[in-house]
Amino acid sequence: IISNSEEETKLIGRKFAKGLKNGDVIVLTGDLGSGKTKFTEGVLQFFGLENEISSPTFNIVNEYVKEDVNVYHFDVYRLEDEDEFYAIGGEEYFEKGICLIEWGEMIEHALPNKYIQISFSRNLEDENLREIVIEEINK
């Protein structure tokens, strides 16, 4: 999927969110500024949670709760290793709602056996262009 702007990346997130349900784990990979948080904004917009979005860089996880859905937005970039993820009870969130995990490749062994990986990459010639690849992972 090609995105030409931040707004388009959010739109892709909104469309993707239509198929999500509690228990889904989505791993977002890509360099800083590649669109992971904008995509997450789109997912949150779909669920009517857009007013609260912030990157959880300093918190590790932000919780967005609504009566019919819980969305957990992780940023595990600052974790030393998977043990730290276990120490915060990270894996307990997997069954509580929908989990979006930025930099999830850093905690690969802590991830469930089945998850969705979304990779974001920037185009070197056009700073607004993003390539987004969505794949289902079964370990």
Feature annotation, model-predicted:
Residues L49-Y64:
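Short beta-strand-centered segment that lines the nucleotide-binding/catalytic pocket of NTP-utilizing
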Residues E63-E105:
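Conserved nucleotide-sensing/catalytic segment adjacent to the nucleotide-binding pocket
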Residues A17-G23:
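Phosphate-binding P-loop
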